[in-house]
């Protein structure tokens, strides 16, 4: 790791680190946009693997995969993540969201509906050097408080509060 960037590793495997100017700047908030099926999750998985190979502590929150699905996907990409998981160098959190907007496990009904607050208050996941959320919009779409702000045309204020939180972390 350099003083200014988190190295993405695998320089002999692909050009990602070079194409991104030497890695991910420390303290950066990075947003990856694209259509459904464009490969955003695979890029997140590539970041996770490369960063852990370069000794960064990484948390990946996925609204799309459970732990088994994640490990199978990583294995198919030849990114072995079992050792980093067992060594606590990598934290994978499956945020399984059902069609009703609830996280499927844990908490009472009120907690399960307040997804964004629960994410922000989960201190352990923010202890990593790099935190990746795949897919953040699923959490926002299913959070009633964020949804209420959008209905009141206050989405800009909600976005500023979220960005402010991430900057403080």
Which role fits each region the language model picked out?
Residues 56-145, 149:
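Conserved inter-motif catalytic segment of the P-loop NTP-binding fold
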Residues 43, 66, 115, 162-165:
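Residue-level preference for nonpolar/small residues embedded in alpha-helices
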Residues 9-13, 40-41, 109-113, 156-159:
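A conditional alpha-helix N-cap/helix-loop micro-motif detector
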Residues 12, 16, 20, 112-123, ...:
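Generic hydrophobic alpha-helical segments
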Residues 35-36, 59, 107-108, 154-155:
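A generic structural signal for short
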């Amino acid at each position: 790791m350099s003083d200014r960037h988190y190295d993405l590793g695998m320089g002999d495997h692909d050009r990602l680190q070079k194409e991104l100017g030497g890695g991910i700047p420390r303290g950066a908030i990075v947003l990856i946009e694209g259509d459904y099926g464009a490969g955003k999750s695979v890029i997140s998985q590539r970041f996770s693997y490369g960063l852990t190979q370069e000794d960064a502590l990484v948390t990946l929150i996925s609204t799309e995969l459970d732990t088994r699905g994640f490990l199978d996907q990583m294995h198919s990409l030849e990114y072995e993540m079992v050792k980093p998981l067992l060594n606590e160098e990598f934290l994978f959190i499956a945020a399984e969201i059902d069609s009703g907007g609830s996280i499927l496990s844990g908490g009472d009904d009120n907690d399960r509906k307040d997804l964004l607050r629960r994410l922000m208050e989960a201190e352990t996941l923010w202890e990593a050097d790099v935190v990746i959320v795949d897919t953040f919009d699923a959490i926002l779409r299913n959070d009633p408080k964020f949804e209420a702000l959008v209905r009141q045309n206050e989405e800009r204020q909600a976005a500023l509060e979220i960005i402010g939180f991430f900057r403080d972390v």
